[in-house]
Every structure is written in C-alpha cells, then in structure tokens.
C-alpha cells in the first residue's frame, strides 16, 4: 500500500507539488533534515501513513509520497517542492520551521509540530489551496498536500501515534492520536490496502529507518520494503499512483489534468491521489468513477489518498485536507477553526464537499482546487470557508468543532470511528488531520469505519466504500456514531459543512456545498439554523437534547441548514428511512410534499445526487443500508446512529436536532424535519430551519391544527402521519423510524416506533425491527430515526402538505416504504400491507378504512383528526409540540439514543413521545394528532396516530405482526409501538386500530399525555431513554432526557396538563383505556420478555388493576364517556383532544396522554366501539396484542419496544382502555371490562396475550389479579366508596402497602385483591366502589401520600371524574369496571403500556409516558403518584396501598418502585431517569404511577394513573420479571 501509495504519492509527487507545500515542507524539512525530516517524514509518513490510513493517510501518503514518495518522487517532489515551495514557500517556510522543529522532536514533537504544522497547514492548506492550486497539479498536490497535511499532522500524529500517537495527541496527536491511533490502528492496520497503510510494525520500522536516516521517508521505506502488492492492493492507491504518476509525469499537466481533475483531481487527489483525476490518469478516471464512492470512501480507500481521499473527499482531502487539514487541522485541532467545519478549509467543505460531492456528486470538482479554481479563487474559497468556519466557530457553539471535533477524534474515533468519520467529515473534522484524529479521524473514521468496518478502505470497494463507509458509519454512528454523530455531528454540526459531511455530513456536507450554497450562504444559513436551532432549542428547553437535538438538527437540519435540514436530515432520514421511506418517500414522497422538497433537496444537486443518488439510490434502493448507511451514515445520527438517535436521531433522532419541536422529533427534520421538512417543503430550506423552528413551532401547532385540519382528515395528517405517515408514518409519520425502534431512534421509536410502529409499521417496525430487531438497531434506529424524522418529515410533509399524497403516497409509498422498511421489518412489512391498510387489519378491522391511512388515517381522521382536528388538540399537539419539541428535541436526542437503543428510540418513542413527542409532537404536532397523537404517542402516539395507521396497519399487522412475532414484535413493537404507539395509533391500529382512530388520536391525546407525560417523562423518559423501554414510548426517555429538558417544558405542559388534569380526568379515562391497553399491551410485551407467566400474571394483575382502575375507568369513561362515550370518544377525543389541545400541555400532557387519550380513547373508543368491543377486545385486545404482542415483542424488543409498545400500549392500551372504557365505556369499557371482566378477553387478550396484552392484562389480572388486585385489603376495604362515589382510601390500609413490606404483604393480598378486582372488574362494583373509594382515598391518601394538593385538584377531578365515571362506570360496571378494568388495564396498559416502559420497564415506559405527566405532575405525581399509587391502588386494587396499590401490582416493586419512583420521580423530574435503569422505569413508574396514577388518578388520569400505575403495576408484574426491571430501578 505504501508503495502503492508511494506510487500514488509518487505520482502524487506531482501532486506533491501541492503536497510539497506541506509535504514539501515536510519534505523540504525532511529533506533539509532529511534524516530528521525523513524521520519526520518517516514518522510523519509512517505514522502519517498510518494516520494516513486515517486520513492522514492522504497526507501521509503525500508526505510519504513526497517524503517516501520516493526517491524519484523526492526529485519530483523537490521539483514540486520547489514549485510548491514557491506557492507554498511561505507555507512551507511556515511549515518548515514547524516541520523542522518537528523533525527535531521527531516523534511527539513532530506530532505537536505537526499540530502546528497542521495549524500552519491550515495556512498551508489554505495557502496550499491557493498555492498548491498552482496547478491542478498543485491541486492534486493539494490533495497530496492535504494528504500530506493530513499525513503530516497525521504522520506526526501517526508517527507519534505509532510511536506515540497517543502521546502525540498533544496536538494533532489528539485528532491524530485518535485518528491515527484508531486510524493508524484501525486504518493502518486493517486497511493496509488503502493508503500506505503502515502496519504498526511497518510504520514503526519505516519510522525508525527514517529516523535513523536509513531512508528518506517512510514512504520510501515502504516503497522499498513494502511489496507493491500491498500497494497495489489499494487500487485507489494504484490508481492514485497512476494518477500520481500521471500527475508526476505531468506536474504541469496536472494543471490540465487537474482541471479534469479539477473536476476530479480533488477527488483524484482525494480519491486516490490521482484516481479521480480521471484525466490525469485512467485510474484516476476509474477512480473518478469510483470516486464518488471511492473518492468518497473508496477514494479514501483507494489510497491513502483514498483515505485522504475520503478524507479529502470527506474532509476535502486535497484541498480541504490541506486547507482543512492545514487550516482546520491546525485550527480545528485547536478547535479554533470551527473545524473546518465549514472550514475544513474551503477544502474541507469544498473538499469534503468536493470529495463527497465528487463522490456523491461524482466530484463536483474538488471544492476548490479540484474545481480547477485559480489560486485566487481557491484562496477566496478558503477565505470564505474560513469565514464560514469562523462563523461556525462563533455561531455554532460547536464551532469550536475542534473540541468537539477533537473529541470527536477521540470520541469520534473511538466512538465509532465512523462518527469521527462522520464527524471528521462532518466536522470537517475529518479534515482536521491534526484532527486527523479528530477531523481526519472523522474521515479516517469514515475510512476507519470503512476500513475497520471495511478494512479495505482501499480494499473496500471504492464504490461500496462510501456506502459501506456510510453504512459503517451509520452503524457506528448508530451507536456511538449516532450519538457521536449526533454529538459529533452535533459538533460536526458546527462544521455543518462537514457536519453535512458528517453522518449526514458526509452527504450533507457535500450537499451543503454542493447544495450550491455558497459558504457564505451556507454560513448564513447555518447561522440562521443555528439561531433558530438555538432558539428552538432554548425554546424547547431541550438543552439536553441540544447537542443531540442540535446535533441532529444540525446534522440533519443544520448541516443542511434549512436546506440541509431538508436536505440533510431528511436525506439522512431520507436516506435512511426515507430511502426506505423517503427513498420512496422522498423519492416517492419526495414527491411527498415536504419530502419532495426534501427529496428535492436531496435531489437538489449534491444532495440530490448524493443523497438522493446515494441516498435515493441506495437508500431508496439499497438505501436502507445505504440509506442508513449512506444517509444514515450520513445521518448517522440516525437518528438512529441510533436513532440517534439517532436521534438523533435521533438521533430517535436525536434528530431532535429539529430543535424546534418539530425538529425535535427524532427528526428534527422528521418532526421538525417533518414540519420543517414539511415546512421545508413549505418553506424553503433557508427559511426552513428558521421557519421550521418558528414555523414549526407555530406551524407545528398551526400545522398541527392546520395540518390536522389540513389533514382535515386528520387522516391526511394522520394519514400524513398515518397515511403519509402511513408512509411517513411508517416512514415519516409512521415514523417507521419513529415507531420503530428508531423510534428507538427516539423519535424513531415512537415516531419510529410509531411510524415504525405504524408504518412503523413500516419503518417503525422496520425501524423497530431494524432497530429493535436488530435490524440494525442502529440502522433501524438510524433509520428509524431518520425514518422517524423522515417519517415525521414525511408525515409532516405529507401531513402538512401532502396529506393526500401522504395518504396516497403513504399507502403506496408506505407500503413500498414499509415494504422497504418492512422488508426490513417483517412486521413492518406486514405492517406495510397493513399500513396499506390491510395488514393493519386490526386497525383496519377497526378501521379498515383506515388501516393505514384509514385507521391511521381514519383514526387520524377521526381520532387523530378528532383531537388533531381540533385545533386545540392540534394545539394541544402543538402545545405539546412545543413542549414536545422539547421533548422531541430530547426525544430526538433520545432518538439518537433511542436509535441506538430501542430504548432511546423507545424512549424516543415514548420519549418518542419525547421524540415522537417530539416527533409526536413534532410529527404529531405536525400531525397534530400526530402531534397529539404523535406527540402523544407521538412517538407512539403521534406516531401512534401515525402509527396507528401504521399502527393500524402495523398494529393490525401487528397482530399479524404480532403473529408476525418479531416483526410483529417489532412490528408489534413497532406495532407495539405501533400498538401502543400504535396503540394510540394502535387504538387506531390496535384498538384501533381499536382506538385506532381514536386512539391514535387518543393515543396522541393520550400520548399527549404520555407524550406530555412522556415529555415529562420525556425528561425522565429521556432519562428513560435510559429507561429505554419506558423510553420507548414514553420514552422517551431518550428523548426525554433531553426531553427532560423538553420534559421540562413538556413537563410544564405536562404539568399544565396536570393542571389540565381535569381534562386528564377525561383524558384520564382514555388514558385509562389506553393505559389499560397500554399496560396490558405493555404487560404483554413486558411480560413477554419477562416470563410469560409472570407476564400473564402481571397482565392479569394489571388487568385486575385495570379493574381496580375502574374508577379510573369510570373516570375515564365518565369523562370520556361523558365526553361522549365512544362517539364521544371522538368527542371525548376531542375533549381529550381539547384537553389535549387544551392540555396538550395541560390536559394532554398529563392527560396529555390522558386527555388525548381520553380524546383519543374517544377516538379510540370511537374506533373502539367502532373497533368496538370485539375489536376492542380484539382490537383493543389486539392492540393490546399488538400492544401486548407488539408490546411483548416490543417488550421483547425490549423495553424500548415496550416503550413504543408501551407507547402503543400506552397509547393503544391507554387509549384502548380509554376507548373501551370510553367508548363503551360501555363498549370498550365493557369490552375492557369484559375483557378485564371477562378476563376472558384478558384471557383472550391473554391469548392475544401479546396481542391482547391488553386483555391479557385483564387476563392477567385474572392470573395476576391477586397480585395487585389482591393488594392487601380489598380495594373495597381500602377504598371505601363515599356517598359521593368518590372512593376513599383507607390510608391505614393503603399506607401499609406503601411500605415495600406492606406491599409485599399486600402483594399476595394483591393477588387476592386482584382477583376481586378482576371480579370487580367483572362485576365487583364494590371493588369498583373500592375504586371509587380508592379514588377517594387516593384523594385522601393522595395527599397523605403525596402532595395531594397538587394531586388533589387533579385528584379531585379525578375523583369527581372517578366518581362520575365510577358512577357511570360503576353502573356501567361494565363500563366502569371496564373503566376500572380498562382503566386498570389501561392503567396497567397505560402503566404498562403507558408505562410501556412498564412493559418495557413499565416504569420507565410508563414513566416515560407517565413520566411526562409524572414530571409534569411530578410533584403531583409524587403525590399523585402516591395518589396514583393510591389511585392505582384504587384503581388497581393492588394499589390499595397507595404504593402498595402499585405495589401490589408491582407490589414491592411497584411499591418500591413507586416510592422509588416517587423519589425517582423527583429525580426523574430532574430527569434523572432515575431508576435509571429502571429509574427510568421507576421514574417511569413513578410517572406511571403518578402520571398514571395520580395524574391520571387525579385528573381522571386515574386511567392513566391506573395506567401509569398499572404501568407500575405492570411494572410490578412485569416488574417482577420485567417488572423487576421496572422495579429494578428500585
């Protein structure tokens, strides 16, 4: 390789002219201090080579080339050097001293010097850009120089790296160290094929030889000692070599050639020294062909250059490297240069862009030099870039990219090389050689990732390389990458250009550049983005999310800036999901609306080509991998990293980046992206960001409403979400990502989850599957995230714009996408079909029409719409959105997290809620329902709604999927998310599916709650994110954590909602339902993972609990019912919605979910009834199943899933519960009751177990009943109905339960109780009364328990509601019971589902869900929790003891959890995700409890409370198993 590289370098020698500047400087210095310099060179070369492998590879190559480039090269070099010298004389001189000192301090010194060098290099690079541009040759040399620069720095680092590259880190060492370290090790070692990859030993040998003066340069040493075979291995190198030779041959000609190369030289340089320079060399030409790939990655691979090329490409190997490396490296390293981000020297940007562009675009001509720009032009470019860089530095907080960048190097490098890669690329860091570690590491990372991942960077298929690299990145990104990406890219963001380069950056970066936006424009845009982002972020209070959020946003959005947003994020999302989703989506969806824009954007120029091409092509096609990989890689963050994560996101992603609420979703673009994208679609990119933020915010609301209205159908919106979403949902709205784990990708989860779930089915499941499944969690996540985002975007876009399109698109697209995704996610697939409508039969069944769109849509329409439709809900959503954004942001972040973990995604989902909330919010916002739904379930909810359709589709498929099992699971998970998420959606999907419509809405609504709750939990969920499962839906934690931030806002909203609690009441009911469902589902889900028996028991318990929840249910029903029962449920939904709207923050928040739930449940109910009982049972059950099943699998999928599941469940369940409760309160309620009552249903559910998690819960109650239900004194004992019908708690009774011991004691009792409860559920008015009493007690005890005051009001409401409900329910018994039961179930479901976390970690999930409220309600929650506990107790008889109540279910755990939860809650509130692990759960639980319990309880959240509690309960039961998890925290 080295030889080859040398050859390349040799050839490059000419290039070396430019190289010579740096390299020459090095060389000159090396020459001067030949020995030393040689050593230096050697070291440089050696290490450089290694580093080179990193990115420095190029520089190393160059260095080596120049130095080692060989004797002959030396001559040329000398010539070149002189030439370059002239050009670079000053640089060289500058460098020379540096070099010389470096030479002196050969190892580390050199490294340090190199740092300086690099710093100077920046100058050099810039100069070089100007100087080397003497000829294209120069340009090439530029490349070479860059390489050398990179190399030099790298070499220094490398040398140091090899030698003391870690120590070298002193300067460049850092980046280099990392880069080289990693690169050296990773790249150097693994990819010896590519750049002169010096094995450590080889490099060391070379270094020694050089040091000893045996050889002039490492390159020479290698040339002499390394078999050409190796060199040849690097085709790129060989080509480069040829090219180099060509160039060498034509030092001057390179000018001409460079001209050609100009178009390619950079790439050539970059790609392979000469590979790009098609003209220069055939090989160049070949490379150019591969360049895009090769250069991009292959190029990097192709030779050191390849690395550099990649770097160069990525980082702007040639120019950028020089510039970037030089400038950025130096600067970046220092961190001054904003990383070259924009800076990477123009080169980076250009180079990267160029490289990337060349890669992607096929070499848009090196950015600068490659452009064949004149020196002045190059200089100008450099200056512009520098300015941009400065701006970035200043503006982008990350501007300092270096810190980020370097860290990136270190972080990135370590992190996932890819990240660095991305980052490097992204951050331009790649460019930073010194940052070689940092910057180049990025590239290196890319290479590394590629190399390590695809060791043969060179070996890597040049063509595949980029893709793989990206994929690698994505994957790497997926995890760390995601985060890194998020973070790094976040950092990278600063470099936006790069950032673009970064995960998305790669694509994005180039895109940006290629975008045709001038650096200034870019900078401005960035600034704008930044500003808005910042604003948004602050606005969102997504501090947590910020980075990710920001990251994603930047990554997604920022990078593209607004355009990038579209372009960037969407593309990534696009790529990932899009490509899956967007692919079609964008492609198709591109037409979608926003998507189109996105697509367009993507398409647009570089991005288009790049993303689209890449993304589109690969993404679209293979896109998935590519998408995730490429785009994702790009996205990296993924949103799904990871989401992201991604995102993001998420993200997942992250992705919150969207910063703005919308963005937040995992996909900032998604959510925000969605809207933003949507907006973007609407707005132009530039505006997009800002507008997006602003608009998104406003729009979110507005759009939510508008969209909602626009969706008018809600359907569209929903559809959008659901439909479009269907696709979007799946993709965007579906948020397959969202729904999917990518939901996990936070957003993803729900969003992903939702979408994924829904479409998510498509993406969701896919995502989920992917993510969750493992489809690549990363990918998935990323995808999810992306998808999520995309989904969101799509959804939003669809929603916003294309509602129809969405629908249309959705169905088809979704289908397609789903298929695509599904392809990935079986569930998805099923879903897809479902989404199509069919699959979702459950949903469909409920809404056949709307399955996807139908149910989803329908749901959305009705439900989704309903709530959504209502402006308020919309608003709600929007509100939620707003906070959700926070959440979302968080979520997105979570997304990022989520992606990575389902959890995050999950979290995201719930968190998603956060993210989804973000997404949900975002999307939901966008979607409105989505917002609410989405938001609510957002992840799940929104998504749910979105998901619903997806969910519906998914859900139904879920069932199928459920059947589908994993997919199902995933699907379910997704669906689950779908379910729960979907649940919401699920309702749509699940119940509706069941509630589907409603639910979705409800979900959203409820989700809102969850969402809000989530958001709140978001925060906690965010924490939850950790919670993961909990997260999922609620999760949210992932998102939440950031969400937490968001949460805060969300929390507020939550709190608001809390206040809204009354609404909550209503919502509560729905939540109840939902919760029940959720919980059930969750339970199923949860249990599933746990032990089935446990699960069953848990579910049963939950079911029982649900029964206990009757009050809640009644409450719910009452409220909901009041609202209109089932029909109401739309009404209610509306109500809820209103509430949701009203309380998106308020009502919705706590109620958020509740309210929304209520509404949604209404919706759900709507469907529920529609779904009707049977469905409810079936659907609800199904949803349950879905939820449950989904949950189960999701659970399996993990807590994450749970989250989504939970979300779904929550959403679904909750809504379900609510729906049923609501709907039938008679219907559903009955249903539920029947279910619960029926236990059969529960059993059935049980059967459905998975599917019927919901039922199962009831069933479980059967099974488990004793546990919670039997909590200590009978509910009746504990709770005495008052004349008012408000249950009073016998605190003496309850409190004991509070104690873990008591709880434990009660645990058995609980069982007893449970049964009674169930009976009550079935026909135990007393217990119901008990419930009432409980409620009362709750009230009563609530205060005692906790700050009932806070709680109290709600509780009072709750009580009233409860009383009402109770009465109604009571009378309804069926209803009430169901209410209770359902609520219970809901509780459980919610708790479980809602808690999803519960399922997952009911606690966290729920917490997620609940958390939000919890957080919001946190205090309340505390009391509420306690109350909830009480309520739960009430609700859940098991909860008799307040905590005991929970406890019973969770019994000790629950109790403890609850207590802990409370504690946690507080913490969580703090966002601690307490329970962190399950703190989340705990938190979740807490939230669950509180949210569920108290908030719900209080508010009527009883349902939710129940849910929450149930969640807790669920947790408890699940806690035992999963419950343990749940309990775990405790």
Swiss-Prot record:
<feature type="compositionally biased region" description="Polar residues">
    <location>
        <begin position="920"/>
        <end position="930"/>
    </location>
</feature>
<keyword id="KW-0217">Developmental protein</keyword>
<dbReference type="InterPro" id="IPR024670">
    <property type="entry name" value="BCL9_beta-catenin-bd_dom"/>
</dbReference>
<keyword id="KW-0539">Nucleus</keyword>
<dbReference type="GO" id="GO:0045944">
    <property type="term" value="P:positive regulation of transcription by RNA polymerase II"/>
</dbReference>
<keyword id="KW-0010">Activator</keyword>
<dbReference type="GO" id="GO:0048368">
    <property type="term" value="P:lateral mesoderm development"/>
</dbReference>
<feature type="compositionally biased region" description="Low complexity">
    <location>
        <begin position="19"/>
        <end position="34"/>
    </location>
</feature>
<feature type="compositionally biased region" description="Basic and acidic residues">
    <location>
        <begin position="81"/>
        <end position="93"/>
    </location>
</feature>
<feature type="compositionally biased region" description="Low complexity">
    <location>
        <begin position="1031"/>
        <end position="1060"/>
    </location>
</feature>
<dbReference type="InterPro" id="IPR015668">
    <property type="entry name" value="Bcl-9/Bcl-9l"/>
</dbReference>
<feature type="compositionally biased region" description="Polar residues">
    <location>
        <begin position="944"/>
        <end position="953"/>
    </location>
</feature>
<feature type="compositionally biased region" description="Polar residues">
    <location>
        <begin position="8"/>
        <end position="18"/>
    </location>
</feature>
<feature type="region of interest" description="Disordered">
    <location>
        <begin position="473"/>
        <end position="503"/>
    </location>
</feature>
<feature type="region of interest" description="Disordered">
    <location>
        <begin position="155"/>
        <end position="187"/>
    </location>
</feature>
<feature type="region of interest" description="Disordered">
    <location>
        <begin position="398"/>
        <end position="439"/>
    </location>
</feature>
<feature type="compositionally biased region" description="Polar residues">
    <location>
        <begin position="875"/>
        <end position="891"/>
    </location>
</feature>
<keyword id="KW-0805">Transcription regulation</keyword>
<dbReference type="GO" id="GO:0003713">
    <property type="term" value="F:transcription coactivator activity"/>
</dbReference>
<feature type="region of interest" description="Disordered">
    <location>
        <begin position="821"/>
        <end position="1076"/>
    </location>
</feature>
<dbReference type="GO" id="GO:0008013">
    <property type="term" value="F:beta-catenin binding"/>
</dbReference>
<protein>
    <recommendedName>
        <fullName>B-cell CLL/lymphoma 9-like protein</fullName>
    </recommendedName>
</protein>
<feature type="compositionally biased region" description="Low complexity">
    <location>
        <begin position="979"/>
        <end position="994"/>
    </location>
</feature>
<dbReference type="Pfam" id="PF11502">
    <property type="entry name" value="BCL9"/>
</dbReference>
<feature type="region of interest" description="Disordered">
    <location>
        <begin position="1"/>
        <end position="101"/>
    </location>
</feature>
<feature type="compositionally biased region" description="Gly residues">
    <location>
        <begin position="170"/>
        <end position="180"/>
    </location>
</feature>
<feature type="compositionally biased region" description="Low complexity">
    <location>
        <begin position="485"/>
        <end position="503"/>
    </location>
</feature>
<feature type="region of interest" description="Disordered">
    <location>
        <begin position="1310"/>
        <end position="1331"/>
    </location>
</feature>
<dbReference type="GO" id="GO:0036342">
    <property type="term" value="P:post-anal tail morphogenesis"/>
</dbReference>
<feature type="region of interest" description="Disordered">
    <location>
        <begin position="1250"/>
        <end position="1279"/>
    </location>
</feature>
<dbReference type="GO" id="GO:0060070">
    <property type="term" value="P:canonical Wnt signaling pathway"/>
</dbReference>
<feature type="compositionally biased region" description="Polar residues">
    <location>
        <begin position="278"/>
        <end position="287"/>
    </location>
</feature>
<feature type="compositionally biased region" description="Pro residues">
    <location>
        <begin position="1258"/>
        <end position="1268"/>
    </location>
</feature>
<feature type="compositionally biased region" description="Low complexity">
    <location>
        <begin position="409"/>
        <end position="426"/>
    </location>
</feature>
<feature type="compositionally biased region" description="Polar residues">
    <location>
        <begin position="247"/>
        <end position="264"/>
    </location>
</feature>
<comment type="function">
    <text>Transcriptional regulator that may act as an activator. Plays a role for mesoderm patterning in early embryogenesis.</text>
</comment>
<dbReference type="GO" id="GO:0030512">
    <property type="term" value="P:negative regulation of transforming growth factor beta receptor signaling pathway"/>
</dbReference>
<feature type="region of interest" description="Disordered">
    <location>
        <begin position="246"/>
        <end position="353"/>
    </location>
</feature>
<keyword id="KW-0804">Transcription</keyword>
<dbReference type="GO" id="GO:1990907">
    <property type="term" value="C:beta-catenin-TCF complex"/>
</dbReference>
<feature type="compositionally biased region" description="Low complexity">
    <location>
        <begin position="960"/>
        <end position="971"/>
    </location>
</feature>
<feature type="compositionally biased region" description="Low complexity">
    <location>
        <begin position="156"/>
        <end position="165"/>
    </location>
</feature>
């Amino acid at each position: 390789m080295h030889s080859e590289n040398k050859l390349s370098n040799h050839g490059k020698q000419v290039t070396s002219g430019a190289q010579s500047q740096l390299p020459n400087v090095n060389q000159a210095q090396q020459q001067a201090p030949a020995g030393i310099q040689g050593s230096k060179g050697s070291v440089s070369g050696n290490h450089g080579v290694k580093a080179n492998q990193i990115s420095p590879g190029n520089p190393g190559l160059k260095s080596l080339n120049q130095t080692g480039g060989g004797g002959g090269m030396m001559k040329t070099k000398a010539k070149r050097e002189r030439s370059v010298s002239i050009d670079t004389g000053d640089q060289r001189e500058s460098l020379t001293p540096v070099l010389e000192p470096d030479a002196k301090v050969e190892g580390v010194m050199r490294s340090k010097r190199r740092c300086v060098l690099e710093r100077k290099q920046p100058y050099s690079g810039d100069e070089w850009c100007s100087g080397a541009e003497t000829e294209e040759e120069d340009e090439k040399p530029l490349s070479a120089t860059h390489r050398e620069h990179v190399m030099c720095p790298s070499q220094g680092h490398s040398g140091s790296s090899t030698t003391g590259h870690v120590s070298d880190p002193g300067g460049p060492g850092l980046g280099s160290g990392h880069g080289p370290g990693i690169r050296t090790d990773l790249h150097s070692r693994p990819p010896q094929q590519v750049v002169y990859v010096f094995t450590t030993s080889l490099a060391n040998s070379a270094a020694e030889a050089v040091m000893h003066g045996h050889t002039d340069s490492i390159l020479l040493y290698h040339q002499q000692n390394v078999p050409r075979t190796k060199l040849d291995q690097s085709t790129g190198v060989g080509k480069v070599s040829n090219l180099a030779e060509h160039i060498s041959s034509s030092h001057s000609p390179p000018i001409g050639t460079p001209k050609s190369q100009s178009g390619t030289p950079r790439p050539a340089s970059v790609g392979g020294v000469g590979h790009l320079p098609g003209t220069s060399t055939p090989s160049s030409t070949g490379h150019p062909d591969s360049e895009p790939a090769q250069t991009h990655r292959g190029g990097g691979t192709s030779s050191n250059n390849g690395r550099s090329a990649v770097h160069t490409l990525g980082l702007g190997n040639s120019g950028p490297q020089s510039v970037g490396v030089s400038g950025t490296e130096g600067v970046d390293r220092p961190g001054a240069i904003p990383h070259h981000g924009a800076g990477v020297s123009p080169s980076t940007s250009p180079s990267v862009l160029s490289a990337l562009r060349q890669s992607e675009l096929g070499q848009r001509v090196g950015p600068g030099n490659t452009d064949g720009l004149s020196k002045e032009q190059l200089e100008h470019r450099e200056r512009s870039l520098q300015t941009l860089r400065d701006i970035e530095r200043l503006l982008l907080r990350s501007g300092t990219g270096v810190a980020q960048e370097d860290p990136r190097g270190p972080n990135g490098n370590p992190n996932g090389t890819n990240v660095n890669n991305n980052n490097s690329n992204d951050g331009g860091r790649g460019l930073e050689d010194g940052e070689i570690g940092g910057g180049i590491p990025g590239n290196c990372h890319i290479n590394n990732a590629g190399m390590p991942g695809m060791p043969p960077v060179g070996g890597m298929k040049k063509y595949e390389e980029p893709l793989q690299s990206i994929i690698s990145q994505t994957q790497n990104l997926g995890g760390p990458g995601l985060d890194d990406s998020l973070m790094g890219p976040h950092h990278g963001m600063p470099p936006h250009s790069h950032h673009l380069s970064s995960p998305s950056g790669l694509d994005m970066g180039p895109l940006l550049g290629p975008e045709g936006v001038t650096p200034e424009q870019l900078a401005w845009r960035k600034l704008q983005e930044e500003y808005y982002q910042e604003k948004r972020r602050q606005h969102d209070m997504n501090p947590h999310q910020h980075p990710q959020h920001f990251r994603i946003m930047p990554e997604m959005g920022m990078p593209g800036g607004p355009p990038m947003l579209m372009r960037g994020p969407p593309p990534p999302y696009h790529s990932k999901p899009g490509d899956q989703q967007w692919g079609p989506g964008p492609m198709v969806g591109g037409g979608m609306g926003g998507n189109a824009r996105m697509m367009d954007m993507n398409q647009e120029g570089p991005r288009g080509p790049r993303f689209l091409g890449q993304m589109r092509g690969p993404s679209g096609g293979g896109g998935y991998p590519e998408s995730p990989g490429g785009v994702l890689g790009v996205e990296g963050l993924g949103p799904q990293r990871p989401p992201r994560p991604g995102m993001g996101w998420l993200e997942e992603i992250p992705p919150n980046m969207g910063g703005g609420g919308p963005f937040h979703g995992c996909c900032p673009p998604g959510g925000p992206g969605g809207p933003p994208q949507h907006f973007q679609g609407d707005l132009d990119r530039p505006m997009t960001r800002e507008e997006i933020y602003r608009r998104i915010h406003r729009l979110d609301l507005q759009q939510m409403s508008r969209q909602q209205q626009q969706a008018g159908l809600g359907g569209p919106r929903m559809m959008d979400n659901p439909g479009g979403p269907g696709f979007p949902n799946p993709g965007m709205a579906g948020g397959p990502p969202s729904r999917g784990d990518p939901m996990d990708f936070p957003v993803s989860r729900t969003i992903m989850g939702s979408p994924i779930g829904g479409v998510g089915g498509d993406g969701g499941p896919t995502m989920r599957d992917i993510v969750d499944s493992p489809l690549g969690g990363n990918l998935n996540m990323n995808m999810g995230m992306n998808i999520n985002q995309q989904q969101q975007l799509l959804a939003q876009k669809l929603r916003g714009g294309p509602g129809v399109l969405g629908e249309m698109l959705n169905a088809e697209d979704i289908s397609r996408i789903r298929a695509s995704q599904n392809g990935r996610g079986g569930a998805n697939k099923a879903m897809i079909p479902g989404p199509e409508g069919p699959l979702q039969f459950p949903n469909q069944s409920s809404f056949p029409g709307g399955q996807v769109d139908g149910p989803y849509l329908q749901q959305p329409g009705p439900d989704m719409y309903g709530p959504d439709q209502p402006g308020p809900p919309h608003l709600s959503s929007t509100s939620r959105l707003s906070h959700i954004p926070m959440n979302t942001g968080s979520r997105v972040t979570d997304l990022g997290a989520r992606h990575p973990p389902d959890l995050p995604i999950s979290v995201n989902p719930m968190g998603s809620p956060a993210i989804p909330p973000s997404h949900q919010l975002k999307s939901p916002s966008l979607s409105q329902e989505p917002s609410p739904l989405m938001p609510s379930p957002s992840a799940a909810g929104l998504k749910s709604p979105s998901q619903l359709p997806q969910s519906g589709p998914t859900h139904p498929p879920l069932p199928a999927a459920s059947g589908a099992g994993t997919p199902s699971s995933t699907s379910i998970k997704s669906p689950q998310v779908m379910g729960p998420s979907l649940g919401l959606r699920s309702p749509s999907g699940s119940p509706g599916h069941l509630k589907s419509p409603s639910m979705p809405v409800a979900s959203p609504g409820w989700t809102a709650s969850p969402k809000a709750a989530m958001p709140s939990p978001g925060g906690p969920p965010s924490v939850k994110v950790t919670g993961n499962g909990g997260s999922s839906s609620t999760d949210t934690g992932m998102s939440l954590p950031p969400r937490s931030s968001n949460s805060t806002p969300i929390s507020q909203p939550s709190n608001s909602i809390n206040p809204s609690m009354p609404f909550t009441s209503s919502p509560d009911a729905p939540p109840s339902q939902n919760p029940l469902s959720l919980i059930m589902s969750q339970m199923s889900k949860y249990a599933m993972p746990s032990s089935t028996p446990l699960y069953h028991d848990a579910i049963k318990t939950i079911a029982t609990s649900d029964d206990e929840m009757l009050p809640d249910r009644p409450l719910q029903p009452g409220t909901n019912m009041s609202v209109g029962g089932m029909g109401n449920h739309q009404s209610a939904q509306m109500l809820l919605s209103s509430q949701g709207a009203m309380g998106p923050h308020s009502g919705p928040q706590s109620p958020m979910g509740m309210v929304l739930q209520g509404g949604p449940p209404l919706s759900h109910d709507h469907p529920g009834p529609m779904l009707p009982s049977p469905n409810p049972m079936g659907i609800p059950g199904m949803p349950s199943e879905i939820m449950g099943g989904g949950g189960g699998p999701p659970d399996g999928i993990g807590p994450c899933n749970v989250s989504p599941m939970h979300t779904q469940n929550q959403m679904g369940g909750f809504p379900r519960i609510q729906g049923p409760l609501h709907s039938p309160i008679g219907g559903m309620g009955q249903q539920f009751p029947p279910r619960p009552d029926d236990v059969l249903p529960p059993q059935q559910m049980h059967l459905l177990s998975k599917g019927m998690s919901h039922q199962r819960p009831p069933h479980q109650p059967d099974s488990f009943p004793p546990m919670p239900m039997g909590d200590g004194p009978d509910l009746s004992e504990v709770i005495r109905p008052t004349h008012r019908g408000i249950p009073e708690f016998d605190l003496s009774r309850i409190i004991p339960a509070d104690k873990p011991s008591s709880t434990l004691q009660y645990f058995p009792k609980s069982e007893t109780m449970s049964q009674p409860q169930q009976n009550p559920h079935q026909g135990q008015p007393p217990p119901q009364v008990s419930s009432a009493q409980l409620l009362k007690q709750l009230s009563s005890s609530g205060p005692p328990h906790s700050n009932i005051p806070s709680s109290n009001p709600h509780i009072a409401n709750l009580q009233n509601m409860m009383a009402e409900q109770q009465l109604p329910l009571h009378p309804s018994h069926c209803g009430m019971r169901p209410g209770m039961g359902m609520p219970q179930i809901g509780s459980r479901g919610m708790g479980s589902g809602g808690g999803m976390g519960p399922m997952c970690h009911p606690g966290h999930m729920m917490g997620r869900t609940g958390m939000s409220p919890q957080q919001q309600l946190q205090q309340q929650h505390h009391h509420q929790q306690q109350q909830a506990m009480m309520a739960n107790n009430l609700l859940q008889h098991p909860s008799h003891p307040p905590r005991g109540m929970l406890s019973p279910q969770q019994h000790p755990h629950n109790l403890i959890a609850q207590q802990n939860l409370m504690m946690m809650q507080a913490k969580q509130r703090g966002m601690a995700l307490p329970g962190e692990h399950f703190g989340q759960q705990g938190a979740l639980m807490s939230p669950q409890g509180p949210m569920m319990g108290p908030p719900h309880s209080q508010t009527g959240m009883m349902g939710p409370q129940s849910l929450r509690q149930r969640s807790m309960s669920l947790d408890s039961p699940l806690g035992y198993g999963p419950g343990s998890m749940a309990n775990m925290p405790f």
